[in-house]
Amino acid sequence: MKLQKPKGTQDILPVAAAKWQYVEDVARETFKQYHYGEIRTPMFEHYEVISRSVGDTTDIVTKEMYDFYDKGDRHITLRPEGTAPVVRSYVENKLFAPEVQKPVKLYYIGSMFRYERPQVGRSREFHQIGVECFGSANPATDVETIAMAYHLFERLGIKGVTLHLNSLGNAASRAAYRQALIDYLSPMRETLSKDSQRRLDENPLRVLDSKEKEDKIAVANAPSILDYLDEDSQAHFDAVRSMLEALAIPYVIDTNMVRGLDYYNHTIFEFITEVNQSELTICAGGRYDGLVEYFGGPATPGFGFGLGLERLLLILDKQGVELPVEEGLDVYIAVLGADANVAALALTQAIRRQGFTVERDYLGRKIKAQFKSADTFKAKVVITLGESEIKAGQAVLKHNQTRQEMTVSFDQIQTDFASIFAECVQ
């Protein structure tokens, strides 16, 4: 049997991983500027953590979750999204306590799992960057969080991103709209897809989110939820729009956008860009003021977003964005002979401890092959160690581009390599 990775997963090899690390580092730096701290939650949770929060009728729960019973007969699921585990952790660790400064700002980077058909930018194991902010109902929190995502895209060099915005209002607004949508869709029930016929009974707002052609036709003239916002909901949405305009962040109102999760209220948003003439959602999120209470905590407003790393990297690649990933070595040590093998080990460690990236030959190859490796690794400096260098206590350093050489003592290399390196590459 030929052993291969499971369908819908990938091996991220070093060249690609360097790009992943760069994007993750930029995200971390950006979030730190907004005073977010990192949180790491388990890759698996109790089934109810996801099903109760995401929604029993969502596609994630009904079709896509990797769930199983463990040896203790506990119903477990691999996490399909990041918000519910973070909210569970917020409540379990009592981050709502008065001594904890509010708002509590958290970010995460990690693997998520959904059983769905693998396609470009969508895998069964995917990696998500997300943020959650707890304790502020201020519309400025909505806008700051959206602006943070926008700031991240700017720093990465992504172009052509459009902010799509909508409001689901509060519970009263949503209930009124739910009934209006049922009244509108019920007469055309038989024209809907099978999934949307089920959604009409369980959660009619899900019909607006359908990608099926017949459902898109059916909802084309559906009533707008914005017509059902009560005074408080309208004031919140107006404030969000006003603040976005104050920050010069362009947006479009998308009344058919409802998000694929049941816990949202008030502001929801997506950042969308175009790749190969197809629209791709690059980031999505919104407000969830009831979720902490649903998990047994006190009433606590929340706002957050998630974005897929694979999709983000795909868009960067399609837009031709060159990430400034560091390549190459500072130093390559060519080794000739058994005595030099030991000396190379000591020199390599000494140079590394001074902050330089170093590689050496381990295979006892001819010098020409070793120099070729130095070129392949894009080494800036090559140090040659042979029997004569060992006897003299000196090494020959060569600039790998200009081929200029200099001879220095082992003592100098071990104590002040920075000065030697600077002189060699100048």
Curated annotation (Swiss-Prot):
Record-level GO BP terms: histidyl-tRNA aminoacylation
Xref: SUPFAM superfamilies: Class II aaRS ABD-related (SSF52954), Class II aaRS and biotin synthetases (SSF55681)
Keyword entries, A-Z: Aminoacyl-tRNA synthetase, ATP-binding, Cytoplasm, Ligase, Nucleotide-binding, Protein biosynthesis
Major location (coarse): cytoplasm
EC code: 6.1.1.21
Enzymatic reactions: tRNA(His) + L-histidine + ATP = L-histidyl-tRNA(His) + AMP + diphosphate + H(+)
Gene Ontology molecular function: ATP binding; catalytic activity, acting on a protein; histidine-tRNA ligase activity; transferase activity
EC category name: ligase
Annotated InterPro entries: aa-tRNA-synth_II (IPR006195), aa-tRNA-synth_II/BPL/LPL (IPR045864), Anticodon-bd (IPR004154), Anticodon-bd_dom_sf (IPR036621), His-tRNA-ligase (IPR015807), HisRS-like_core (IPR041715), HisRS/HisZ (IPR004516), HisRS_anticodon (IPR033656)
Subcellular location: Cytoplasm
Source organism superkingdom: Bacteria
Family: Belongs to the class-II aminoacyl-tRNA synthetase family.
Listed PANTHER family: HISTIDINE--TRNA LIGASE, MITOCHONDRIAL-RELATED (PTHR43707:SF1), HISTIDYL-TRNA SYNTHETASE (PTHR43707)
NCBIfam families referenced in this protein's UniProt entry, alphabetically: hisS
The protein's name in its UniProt record: Histidine--tRNA ligase
Species, as recorded: Streptococcus equi subsp. zooepidemicus (strain H70)
